[in-house]
From Swiss-Prot:
Protein name stated in the entry: Large ribosomal subunit protein uL14
SUPFAM superfamilies: Ribosomal protein L14
GO BP annotation list: translation
Keywords linked to the UniProt accession: Ribonucleoprotein, Ribosomal protein, RNA-binding, rRNA-binding
Function: Binds to 23S rRNA. Forms part of two intersubunit bridges in the 70S ribosome.
One annotated Gene Ontology cellular component of this protein: cytosolic large ribosomal subunit
Source taxonomy: Bacteria, Pseudomonadati, Thermodesulfobacteriota, Desulfuromonadia, Geobacterales
């Protein structure tokens, strides 16, 4: 469960290390984002000579949340951290690699490029 002012780790090699959530996209009164949702973020920490710089405003898709996520079969899944992948306006990842597992719910939200780059889909 991601809301405004949440700090996110970055799960790709775009060069950003920490993201600060500015807005949850999907309606003016929407408060929370879960796995597969898009948020607008500011880059809080970045590596030098990277594709994104500190202070850039970027869009990111949530790939892991610490809040447990219910599945239709009754099972739950949760991760150790809140992580996102920086995306462009075409909803494709800016980086070329994804680090760590991602949730299966991204497949239903049509983020196939992230699914194919991820080392593990849970």
């Amino acid at each position: 469960m991601i809301q405004m002012q949440t700090i996110l780790d970055v799960a790709d090699n775009s060069g950003a290390k920490k993201l600060f959530c500015i807005k949850v996209l999907g309606g003016s009164k929407r408060k929370y984002a879960g796995v597969g949702d898009i948020v607008v973020c500011s880059v809080r920490e970045a590596l030098p000579n990277s594709k994104v710089k500190k202070g850039d405003v970027v869009k990111a898709v949530i790939v892991r949340t610490a809040k447990e996520l219910g599945r239709p079969d009754g099972s739950y899944i949760r991760f150790d951290n809140n992580s996102g992948v920086v995306i462009n306006n075409a909803k494709e990842p800016v980086g070329t690699r994804i680090f760590g597992p991602v949730a299966r719910e991204l497949r239903a939200k049509k983020f196939m490029k992230i699914i194919s780059l991820a080392p593990e889909v849970l």
